[in-house]
From Swiss-Prot:
Family: Belongs to the YajQ family.
Protein name per UniProt: Nucleotide-binding protein XOO0711
Entries under SUPFAM superfamilies matching the protein: YajQ-like
Entry annotated with the keyword Nucleotide-binding: yes
UniProt xrefs under HAMAP family: YajQ
Keyword terms: Nucleotide-binding
PANTHER family: UPF0234 PROTEIN YAJQ (PTHR30476:SF0)
Residue stretches in coiled coil: none
The species this protein was found in: Xanthomonas oryzae pv. oryzae (strain KACC10331 / KXO85)
Amino acid sequence: MPSFDVVSEVNKHELTNAVDQANRELDTRFDFKGVQAKFELEDGKVINQSAPSDFQVKQMTDILRARLLARGIDVRCLEFGDMETNLAGARQKVTVKQGIEQKQAKQLVAKLKEAKLKVEAQINGDKLRITGKKRDDLQDAIALLKKADFELPLQFDNFRD
C-alpha cells in the first residue's frame, strides 16, 4: 500500500548558516556598532539572543526571522521564551521546535477523518504515517494538509508506492 510520512523538521545545517548570517549582519549594522549583541546556537535546538537592552533584542528577533526565511526555514517552528532583563543586559531564548507533538498529530488525524478521505493515519513518535490504497488518495491528503493552517511547518517525505 502506498504511504508517506508527515514530519516537522528543520535542517540543522541551514539553521547554523542562518544564525551565522544573522551574527554577521549584527556586526555590519550601524545601530549595533560597539554593542555586545550576539546570537548563539546551542545543540541545534536553542538560539540565545543577548544584547544590552530589550529593544535591541526585539530588533535582533526581526533580523533572525529575516535570515531564517532567506535560508528557507519556516519561522513557525520558533518558540520565543520570556525576555530576561537585568543590569548586564537582556536575553531571550528561542526554541526551535522539531517533530510533531501528540496533540498536534491528533489534530492532523482529525482533519483527515473529517475530510472523509480513504486514508489511514498512524502516529509514530514525532511523525505521522499516512497510508492509502491509491496514490491519488495520498495526493489528496497532502493537498488537504497543505491547505489547512497549522501552527507548525509540515514536510512530506518517504513517499512509497
